Amino acid sequence: MPGKHQQFQDPEVGCCGKYFLFGFNIVFWVLGALFLAIGLWAWGEKGVLSNISGLTDLGGLDPVWLFVVIGGIMSVLGFAGCIGALRENTFLLKFFSVFLGLIFFLELAAGILAFVFKDWIRDQLNLFINNNVKAYRDDIDLQNLIDFAQEYWSCCGARGPNDWNLNIYFNCTDLNPSRERCGVPFSCCVRDPAEDVLNTQCGYDIRLKLELEQQGSIYTKGCVGQFEKWLQDNLIVVAGVLVAIALLQICGICLAQNLVSDIEAVKANW
């Protein structure tokens, strides 16, 4: 009987995983660069790039920070994953998987802490919103963000309309010369569907009235409570999005680690 010869196949890099990782990360890289460009453009329009100290002058949150930070992280991750997969660079692939793993565990830790320390998170959210209420007129992007949140969640202030007493333009002190004294922003007003033109003065002097008289004109519930209610009403959707993001991160880590193993196996066979 003729002898049987066992054939050994040389290890090779899996093309499917390699190009899937490359394609996914090039999209991620482009989106990150776009976010970063929008953030830098917004800062340029506000003159922040020519005066870096302006970054710390704002008392509240500058929404542009979200674009810059998220865009920067996405760009770095996308670059490492894209170039690492294309050039079969194990250093970049390991950096990608470790960085992505770190982000995943930070998200997981944040989720657990938010569940365990719900009351503390609620207090911090209340403090955060009130700090931004104080800085409402200081930055147009922050102003637009607050207006959007109050209109979307049908709320006013962190715990109620009286939180606007923290703002120098809306407080009720006798020394306040502003026409907006004892008022609230227009985004607190209950919109009349029949109105074609937005009445930006609808909140003037509204807090001089009794609370029962305010109810038909402005939202009297705070944004912290309304946000919690929104989370409860949309818990399945929010949980689904978070799980999908987590699965994508785990998939990215596994693909990168598998590609590193293939590359090292090929190198060891040289």
From Swiss-Prot:
Keywords: Cell membrane, Disulfide bond, Glycoprotein, Membrane, Transmembrane, Transmembrane helix. Its main location: membrane. Disulfide bonds join 155-223, 156-188, 172-182, 189-202. It is a multi-pass membrane protein. It is found in: Cell membrane. One of its GO terms (biological process) is establishment of protein localization to organelle. The chain crosses the membrane at residues 20-40, 64-84, 95-115, 235-255. CDD domains: TM4SF9_like_LEL. SUPFAM superfamilies: Tetraspanin (SSF48652). Part of TspanC8 subgroup, composed of 6 members that interact with the transmembrane metalloprotease ADAM10. This interaction is required for ADAM10 exit from the endoplasmic reticulum and for enzymatic maturation and trafficking to the cell surface as well as substrate specificity. Different TspanC8/ADAM10 complexes have distinct substrates. Seems to regulate VE-cadherin expression in endothelial cells probably through interaction with ADAM10, promoting leukocyte transmigration. Interacts with ADAM10; the interaction influences ADAM10 substrate specificity, endocytosis and turnover. This is Tetraspanin-17. The lineage of its organism: Eukaryota, Metazoa, Chordata, Craniata, Vertebrata.
